[in-house]
């Protein structure tokens, strides 16, 4: 099937979806209605671009006819030639855009995510930087209209983040934040540094798609669940009733502790969300490691320990090492205005995928 047949098939399906979504039987079936609505939303941009592309093709045909019929009218002929030139340029742009829109979609792109941030090398400074990254993602989520919920956090004595786990919910969250997994390096003068020397610290970020129970079922026999009293500052027990939950996936040793909520059931539900995502991610990583290099992530190596980005405070500079992007906008990016970085990563990924398809 060539590209035009593919595009026509997408448009035909889009029109079929429009009819289905007005069918009373579909409307009354909430699950099916949501699935079809999601499919329609995912194809809308492709169909809109394809329809605009067909209009450009028609404009080219009309301009060519006009040039043939304009003999003896230099002004009309010149106008038609100019329109033909502009339309041919637009045709090339649409063809590139449509190739990208037809690229196979990551099945996780529309999912919510579990976001984990940890202070790594650098002690207190690494924990403080992990807090900066948390704020950056929270503010970016606000700009996207997403819901950002901190599910579990652990702070150190200077107010930094040793570890934080958050759920980010909304439209196409994974598609935009999936490139954030890896080691984030910071270069700055710590507040405790009297000599003004720049220190280098690292925080790690892990982005995992939320996994529904129907998608990945964990055998209850593979889980060990411990219930204990939640602890407050200084280690004192803050609840008379044991509400905190420790959940261990025995085959992998993956462990989750949850005590943020006031009830045991809510802590258990949140712990289950996280452990399901972590276990699914664990086995997905094993599968990815078994694939050849071409089938690994095109942005970076896919190695979770890979240094992906450096934040240099003295020079107000952010560098993404995977795509060679450097921006003198560190303050802007840390305030949540991440679109320039994320758009560049998406474009790079799409370009590499196109190249691999053409080879």
Curated annotation (Swiss-Prot):
Predominant cellular place of this UniProt entry's protein: cytoplasm
Modification comment: Methylated by PrmC. Methylation increases the termination efficiency of RF1.
GO CC, any one term: cytoplasm
One Pfam family matching this protein: PCRF
Annotated InterPro entries: PCRF (IPR005139), Pep_chain_release_fac_I (IPR000352), Pep_chain_release_fac_I_sf (IPR045853), Prokaryotic/Mito_RF (IPR050057), RF-1 (IPR004373)
Modified residues (N5-methylglutamine): 236
Entry keyword annotation includes Protein biosynthesis: yes
Annotated keywords: Cytoplasm, Methylation, Protein biosynthesis
Signal peptide: none
MF terms in GO: translation release factor activity, codon specific
Compartments, record wording: Cytoplasm
Entry similarity comment: Belongs to the prokaryotic/mitochondrial release factor family.
HAMAP family found in the cross-reference section: Rel_fac_1 (MF_00093)
Function text: Peptide chain release factor 1 directs the termination of translation in response to the peptide chain termination codons UAG and UAA.
Listed NCBIfam families: prfA, PRK00591.1
Protein name per UniProt: Peptide chain release factor 1
Provenance organism: Streptococcus pyogenes serotype M6 (strain ATCC BAA-946 / MGAS10394)
Gene name, Swiss-Prot/TrEMBL: prfA
